[in-house]
Swiss-Prot record, chain A:
Record flagged with keyword Transport: yes
Renumbered residue ranges of the record's region Disordered: 188-212
Descriptive protein name: Ras-related protein Rab-2
Compartments where found: Endoplasmic reticulum-Golgi intermediate compartment membrane; Endoplasmic reticulum membrane; Golgi apparatus membrane
Family: Belongs to the small GTPase superfamily. Rab family.
Lipid-conjugated positions (S-geranylgeranyl cysteine): C211, C212
Length: 212, 923
């Protein structure tokens, strides 16, 4: 499985907003209505294509509970992208975004791409946070925004892929130092500058001298 | 330092006292001195004392030293001393002064560790020292953290986890260019990650897999030293029981990166020397690492995914070649077999590959056969035999095709007298005198038919030729005979397990079993016997289980032992209580629980072998049903007597009976619906059986068609091998040739020079030769001149007397001579020009070799000059000759003028010539 780039993501946000379900929907294309509480972090991976290039996403799904905060903080530094998730049916999860963002900005590298996600868009009837509010928050803090539903899979692909596109663009713009793996980006094995075999330009003409 | 010197000179008991005093005074100096130098000296002295007076230094200096760490961190030296002091008082490692430190009890270091980590800030302080690059700070910090982790692992893990970037900082140590720090960091990370899934995940997130695998590779993989061992231990720490990390490991393509480490170079010299102990350890750990990824205890999808990758990247192939390689130590081989087992277990693709592996023997045999040969061989190490059985089981696990292939080798149709088959080996093992072989073979056979009714029926067809003259006996009957003959515990348990597995879910086998009337009485006698130890109890329990199975899967074809008959016998002869008791003893046995834990046979001693994992599963699933079959619906027995009755009694009875009738009707309805569904399922099952049979036939046909192909391909392989061999030989030859050629090339230049020298020498000699020739030519010319002079004088002298003809003749002769000389000269000239050309050529060669060039050119130029002068001389000579010619012409004309006949005598001519010459002179 060769790839051009490898991006490391983390998923953060309050407990119960659907982080693990988003990951499961993205990696396994299925929805699990009753999901165990995440303990610490769980890992998932998938290959996507951007601009005709294979990109491997390695995703660490973190526990939302406060007690795991110290553990999840360790993952900020090495991540290239973060999905910050709240639940549109629970206002408090939206209110906590500022804390999450501060935490993320403090511990991550400054170039980390953050995607704000309002999850559970299928539960329109129980909506407590308007889409406009999410958009406004994202605009204010320079984030990308999207509403998703891990249950119906609406926008789930897009959320992960758009984040990757943003990172990819930053690489093209030279913002990321791609040789520093601590940024959560790695160049694929076959794309690293390999030593090309040089063609030696002919051995000097050794003819002549036999003209008599 | 004075104090210190005093201490060293003091006797033992005084030493302790004065030691404490010294420590006290040093502590005071550290805390009160305002000068950094003084403090540093005092801390250095404390460090020196800290090994010998751990208790004193630990109790008195801890806070003071912590203070130093906090406030003197600009001075690397004092920090280093303080950290070393901490290390000494925390470390429980035995030192040179072991007797002294032991006085304080065993876990002094642990107690100090507790005090130290009571304030979590102390640990953060230590972690912050890791930012310091100075070796005197970083190294002792790593050592101190390691010893703290060793002493109080759980507590410290929690503290480090909470410190921001704590784990990340420790991970960064792996990139330290100083090897000693990197290596100690490996030990530190090993302690840090032990049993803590969250830290394991963070460490993995920090690219641990990549970095560790890089270190392993840089250190020479399995040929590397203890650092490789530490790396492999760390990898295992990170992966064991950590599904998330395992998934990451697989997704990060790290399995592929492990692959090169498994390539064993089959060098002849390594065969003689053997494997170093370190290499054996490294290989062992590497294999265990693979097993961690495909362990049957992992989540199944995880294991399946890893198995697939291992096949695709060629890791399984490498493992199989280690299996078949020579010179591999027995314990590595055993672990390799275990590893192969778990890589193929339950994975159809990998099992198929394994079945195709051939051992490099003559003729090539399937690896499975070669392995089974070891299994039934008493001389092989016990653990190796266990591993082979595990491998065989894993090969057959969820592998109906494999099962049928094995059973096929037992059937008479497929019998091939020449080659050894798995079936022959299993039968041999089953009836060998070695109880362990009996056990291994029966369990192996059990796995060939487990959960596979078709193969159970096929196995019934197996007939054995016992001895000459007597009729063949079926395998089933032979097993029963052996069982009834007694024998060792493992033999009987093995036989009972295969019989239980065989008869379960297979009514035909049950009826075969019951047809021999000796079997049931034997079982009854075993179960009803009350004597015996723990082991006999197992046998009795298994006999009860077998009896239960005979009831459970009884199709009532045997009249003597129909379901009801059996029940009757059991209840009368054994009793329900006793039967239940015997049956339950099986599961209560310690070896049963041990075997039920995991499929891997992790026995250390042959005596530990009792139960098989697969059998425990069978037992678990059928135990209750057997009990139900034996005890349930036992209420059929009607023991009531009808006594003197009243109307009420009759009414009651009637009501009871009516109720019963109702119940029975319901029961009948239930049973009818059951029967209908059962019929349906029977039809379906029959269809399935038919399908399976068809498939089987198809497979057989395929197999038949495949086998010639495979023989052809083996021929092809042989010829290819031969070709490869010859090519290799050619390669070798050409190699030798190229070597000699290159040698020649090396010597080429000096040779060329010498060749040139020789040519020059030759040229020189040639030139000398030509010089000589020219000289001789010149002398000849002189002579000719003289002769001419003589002639002219003669001519002039005898101008009147000598006849012209003579003169003419002489002239002709001289002309001829001259012609000869000119020819010779021309010839020489030609040679000279040729040599000139040669010289030019050589000049080209000379130019290429700059060393020799100057001399050669100079010489050559000299030669040229010489030659030029010679040419000039020759030219002169030519001119002279021309002059002579002219003169001769003149003489001729003169002679003619004189009227003398040219045809005169030579003498006259001479005289005339002399005369002429004289005349000329006179002119």
């Amino acid at each position: 499985m060769s790839y051009a780039y490898l991006f490391k993501y983390i998923i953060i946000g309050d407990t119960g907003v659907g982080k693990s379900c988003l990951l499961l929907q993205f990696t396994d294309k299925r929805f699990q209505p009753v999901h165990d509480l995440t303990i610490g972090v769980e890992f998932g991976a998938r290959m996507i294509t951007i601009d005709g290039k294979q990109i491997k996403l390695q995703i660490w799904d973190t526990a939302g509970q406060e007690s795991f905060r110290s553990i999840t903080r360790s993952y900020y530094r090495g991540a290239a992208g973060a999905l910050l998730v709240y639940d549109i049916t629970r206002r408090d999860t939206f209110n906590h975004l500022t804390t999450w963002l501060e935490d993320a900005r403090q511990h991550s590298n400054s170039n980390m791409v953050i995607m704000l996600i309002g999850n559970k868009s299928d539960l329109e009837a129980r909506r407590e946070v308007k889409k406009e509010e999410g958009e406004a928050f994202a605009r204010e803090h320079g984030l990308i925004f999207m509403e998703t539903s891990a249950k119906t899979a609406a926008n789930v692909e897009e959320a992960f892929i758009n984040t990757a596109k943003e990172i990819y663009q930053k690489i093209q713009d030279g913002v990321f130092d791609i040789n520093n793996e601590a940024n959560g980006i790695k160049i694929g094995p076959q794309h690293s500058p390999a030593s090309q075999s040089l063609n030696v330009g002919g051995s000097g003409g050794n003819q002549g001298g036999n003209c008599c | 330092m004075d104090y210190f010197r005093k201490v060293l000179g003091a006797p033992q008991d005084v030493q302790t006292n004065s030691g404490a005093d010294t420590v006290e005074r040093l502590c005071e100096r550290v805390s009160s001195s305002t000068l950094l130098d003084d403090r540093r000296d005092a801390v250095r002295a404390l460090k020196a004392l800290s090994k010998k007076f751990r208790l004193e230094v630990g109790t008195q200096a801890m806070d003071i030293l912590l203070n130093v760490l906090e406030h003197d961190r600009t001075d690397a030296e004092i920090i280093g001393y303080a950290l070393d002091t901490f290390y000494h008082i925390m470390s429980n490692e035995p030192t040179d002064e072991d007797d002294v430190s032991n006085v304080y009890g065993h876990d002094l270091g642990g107690q100090f560790t507790e005090i130290f980590i009571k304030h979590a800030e102390n640990v953060s302080l230590l972690l912050s020292f890791l930012e310091e690059y100075d070796f005197h700070v970083r190294w002792p910090t790593v050592k101190l953290l390691t010893v703290l982790l060793t002493n109080r692992q759980k507590e410290l893990q929690e503290i480090i986890l909470v410190v921001p970037m704590g784990v990340s900082r420790l991970m960064d140590l792996l990139s330290d260019s100083r090897e000693i720090i990197r290596n100690d960091a490996l030990l530190l990370l090993n302690q840090l990650t032990k049993g803590h899934a969250n830290i394991q995940k963070i460490v993995a997130f920090e690219n641990a897999f990549e970095r560790i695998i890089d270190i392993i590779r840089d250190e020479g993989a399995t040929d590397g030293g203890i650092v490789v061992e530490d790396c492999l231990l760390l990898l295992q720490n990170l992966l064991r029981n950590n599904a998330s990390n395992q998934n990451f490991f697989k997704e990060g393509s790290y399995i592929q990166k492990l692959k090169p480490f498994f390539q064993i170079h089959d060098e002849p010299h390594s065969k003689q020397i053997g494997w170093s102990a370190q290499k054996v350890t490294n290989m062992h750990l590497l294999l265990q690492l693979v097993r961690t990824l495909v362990s049957p205890n992992n989540p199944q999808n995880q294991t399946v995914a890893c198995q697939k990758v291992m096949n695709q990247c060629g890791l399984l192939q490498d493992l199989c070649s280690i299996l078949m390689a020579s010179g591999v130590p027995a314990d590595v081989l055993t672990e390799t077999i275990n590893t192969v087992s778990e890589v193929i277990r339950g994975s159809q693709m990998n099992q198929e590959y394994f079945a195709s592996v051939l051992a490099p023997s003559t003729p090539p045999r399937p690896a499975i056969v070669v392995l089974l040969m070891s299994m039934v061989n008493e001389k092989q190490p016990f653990v190796l035999r266990c591993a082979v059985l595990y491998c065989f089981q894993s090969f057959l696990y969820k592998n109906e095709v494999g099962q049928s292939q094995i059973i096929q080798t037992l059937l008479p149709t497929a019998a091939d007298a020449n080659s050894i088959t798995a079936g022959q080996l299993l039968c041999g093992g089953l009836f060998s005198a070695d109880p362990l072989s009996n056990w291994f073979a029966s369990v192996a056979l059990l796995h060939a038919i487990v959960e596979n009714p078709t193969q159970k029926e096929q196995l019934l067809r197996v007939q054995l030729a016992t001895s000459l003259g007597s009729p063949p006996v079926s395998l089933l009957q032979q097993c029963c005979n052996m069982l009834s003959q007694g024998g060792k515990l493992q033999t009987r348990i093995g036989l009972l397990m295969i019989l239980c597995g065989w008869l379960s879910d297979c009514p035909i086998a049950v009826s075969h079993f019951l047809n021999n009337t000796a079997n049931v009485p034997y079982l009854i006698s075993q179960v009803s016997s009350s004597e015996g130890d723990e082991h006999e109890a197992i046998v009795q329990g298994l006999c009860a289980f077998l009896l239960g199975i005979c009831m459970l899967y009884n199709d009532d074809t045997s009249e003597a032992f129909s379901k009801t008959a059996l029940k009757q016998i059991m209840q009368n002869r054994i009793g329900l209580e006793s039967f239940t008791d015997k049956l339950s003893q099986v599961a209560q046995n310690e070896s049963y629980t041990r075997a039920a834990k995991k499929p891997h046979l992790y026995h250390k001693h042959p005596s530990e072998i009792v139960f098989d994992y697969e059998f425990t599963r069978l037992f678990k699933s059928l135990e209750n049903e057997v009990l139900k079959a034996v005890s349930g619906s036992g209420s059929n027995i009607n023991g009531r007597k009808s006594g003197p009755s009243t109307e009420q009694q009759y009414k009651n009875l009637l009501k009871e009976q009516e109720d019963q009738v109702l119940l029975l009707r319901q029961r009948i309805e239930e049973l009818q619906s059951h029967a209908i569904s059962a019929d349906k399922s029977i039809v379906e099952l029959q269809r399935q059986v038919q399908q399976l049979k068809d498939q089987n036939a198809l497979l057989k046909a395929q197999k038949g068609s495949l086998s010639p192909a495979s023989s052809i391909s083996s021929d092809e392989v042989d010829s290819l091998k031969r070709e490869v061999e010859s090519l290799r030989l050619q390669l070798h030859n050409s190699h030798i040739f190229s070597n000699t050629v290159s040698d020649e090339n090396k010597e080429n230049d000096p040779d060329g020079a010498s060749v040139l020298n020789v040519t020059i020498a030759r040229l020189q000699s040639e030139l000398a030769h030509k010089d000589e020739e020219v000289l001789s030519l010149r002398s000849e010319l002189d002579r000719v001149n003289e002769v001419l002079k003589q002639k002219t004088s003669e001519q002039t002298a005898a101008s009147s007397s000598v006849s012209n003809a003579e003169v003419e003749l002489k002239l002709q002769q001289t002309e001829e001579k001259l012609k000869l000389i000119t020819d010779e000269r021309n010839h020489l000239q030609e040679r000279l020009t040729k040599s000139n050309e040669e010289n030019l050529k050589l000049a080209n060669t000379i130019r290429k070799l700059e060393d020799e060039k100057v001399d050669a050119v100079n010489e050559k130029e000299n030669l040229k000059e010489e030659m030029d002068t010679l040419k000039k001389e020759q030219d002169d000579l030519l001119v002279l000759l021309a002059d002579q010619d002219v003169k001769i012409d003149k003489y001729k004309t003169k002679l003619k003028e004189l009227g003398q006949e040219v045809e005169d005598d030579d003498d006259d001519d001479d005289e005339l010539g002399e005369d002429n010459e004289e005349d000329l002179d006179a002119d």
